[in-house]
Amino acid sequence: MNKSESLYAAAQQLIPGGVNSPVRAFNGVGGTPLFIERADGAYLYDVDEQAYIDYVGSWGPMVLGHNHPSIRDAVIAAAERGLSFGAPTEMEVQMARLVTSLVPSMDMVRMVNSGTEATMSAIRLARGYTGRDKIIKFEGCYHGHADCLLVKAGSGALTLGQPNSPGVPADFARHTLTCVYNDLSSVRTTFEQYPDEIAAIIVEPVAGNMNCVPPLPDFLPGLRALCDEFGALFIIDEVMTGFRVALAGAQSHYGVVPDLTCLGKIIGGGMPVGAFGGKREVMQALAPTGPVYQAGTLSGNPIAMAAGFACLTEVAKPGVHEKLTALTNQLADGLLAAAKAENIPLVVNQAGGMFGLFFTDAESVTCYQDVMKCDVERFKRFFHMMLEEGIYLAPSAFEAGFMSLAHTPQDIERTIEAAQICFSRL
């Protein structure tokens, strides 16, 4: 028994499933999860002293790579001044100014502690602002583990085979209307069925929790138009795509302007940070200026704000996203070529610094039903083969991969070489 196996056995006696977030348990691929000792740049190092090229990046936040000196130094400096104050700080103002300058659709922003808090709060705000109860979400899109959003969800809910989570009361779920991602007709039909009851649409602009499924060209603009037609708010969940697909998020890349935006992951630079923001008129409905209540003891934590500010300052530098996209292109093209050489049917989806691998004979993967037809068993074998070659992919066929600026062309060539070996054995 190696050290990861020993730690996992101990953890299972103390923590449900041995992990503090389900997808980490390797249930989607089988086997024992790696216990990580440290990370640096594009590499993870486990407790058994094995090194891996990392394409999980802490599930998205590590766009600069692990242990980036600017973020590390900012965290240390902030910690020396105190860990938490429960009172406003100058860094909160600086962080809010930076975020709203980078994302033009956000006139105002409220900091929270996670992406789940951001989406949950945005939904409450939309309901309070519109006076309506129902929301529209999409099959396979995951917006955190709030009760109203765990309906036909993606991410770990798909991995567990529980798209509708037990513990969500039917009274909550009935207010969540589920449509088909990339299918505007299903959305119009739903609006026509409940024309005066829908408070908002919430959508991942790139569905990153049923692997990586970008929007069709007319999808996001069509959602914006339907919200305008029926008086609903348009909420874009950029927890995963924000500052990764483009500096101003996927909304700028695809040319749409939401009423509210949810952020997480990169905004914290590896610390637990989320945020939601949007039009001034809507945001001023939040307490203490308005009647919609939202609060958090650790929201705007000074260490988290320092980490986020340092991360976004680096991400905003010229050429960052061009480089990130070029590296992802190199990986996607190389994997496709390697699979083709071994007659392995593979679709690779990509959006900026995100990518997804689908073992399928289909020409494209554009919705939840396409994803569910892919060969999950083949992915499981591929995952473990790649792990043996020192490549760490997301341990689920339903999770996106993430590139970082710390990856080098040589790292990517090494990854493609490993994939060639694995494809030849699949």
UniProtKB/Swiss-Prot annotation:
GO molecular function: glutamate-1-semialdehyde 2,1-aminomutase activity; pyridoxal phosphate binding; transaminase activity
The protein's Enzyme Commission number: 5.4.3.8
GO cellular component, one term: cytoplasm
Cofactor(s) listed in the protein's UniProt record: pyridoxal 5'-phosphate
Pfam families associated with the record: Aminotran_3 (PF00202)
Reaction catalysed by this enzyme: (S)-4-amino-5-oxopentanoate = 5-aminolevulinate
Signal peptide (from-to): none
Residues bearing PTM N6-(pyridoxal phosphate)lysine: 265
Keyword Isomerase belongs to the record: yes
Statement: the UniProt record of this protein carries the keyword ATP-binding: no
InterPro entries: 4pyrrol_synth_GluAld_NH2Trfase (IPR004639), Aminotrans_3 (IPR005814), Aminotrans_3_PPA_site (IPR049704), PyrdxlP-dep_Trfase (IPR015424), PyrdxlP-dep_Trfase_major (IPR015421), PyrdxlP-dep_Trfase_small (IPR015422)
Compartments where found: Cytoplasm
GO BP of this protein: protoporphyrinogen IX biosynthetic process
Keywords in alphabetical order: Cytoplasm, Isomerase, Porphyrin biosynthesis, Pyridoxal phosphate
Gene3D superfamilies in the record: Aspartate Aminotransferase, domain 1, Type I PLP-dependent aspartate aminotransferase-like (Major domain)
Pathway: Porphyrin-containing compound metabolism; protoporphyrin-IX biosynthesis; 5-aminolevulinate from L-glutamyl-tRNA(Glu): step 2/2
NCBIfam families: hemL, PRK00062.1
Oligomeric and partner information: Homodimer.
Similarity field: Belongs to the class-III pyridoxal-phosphate-dependent aminotransferase family. HemL subfamily.
Protein name (database record): Glutamate-1-semialdehyde 2,1-aminomutase
